[in-house]
Amino acid sequence: MSTAHNRANIEDVAKVVLMPGDPLRAKLIAESLLKDAVLFNDVRGMLGYTGTYKGKRVSVMGSGMGMASMGIYSYELFKFYDVDAIIRVGSTGSYSERLPMKSVALVKGSYSESTYA
């Protein structure tokens, strides 16, 4: 079933989706880490692939920039494609010197003081 932002059929998308912001980073991850990766989406330039990693079926798809774009793609993946988990991968900034460049952060949650929608 296609949506306005995703051309995939439900069986094209794995239960676990890695989501970098940059669609070209999704392509790089698919080409370098996934075995037998197949493109399932290219609508609006947002690339999505499914393949296997160490025998586990995994998808990777760009989210675009910002919360609005992430909100659209994550909503559709959960609501229409029966995804169980989305794992955000990629870069970010830090306000703390305790978290130096090239650190790895495993985040359990986040919040915003924004009043945006």
Regions found by a protein language model. Name each.
Residues 42-117:
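Glycine-rich phosphate- or other oxyanion-binding loops that anchor nucleotides, phosphorylated ligands
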Residues 1-72:
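N-terminal short beta-loop-beta anion/metal-coordinating cradle
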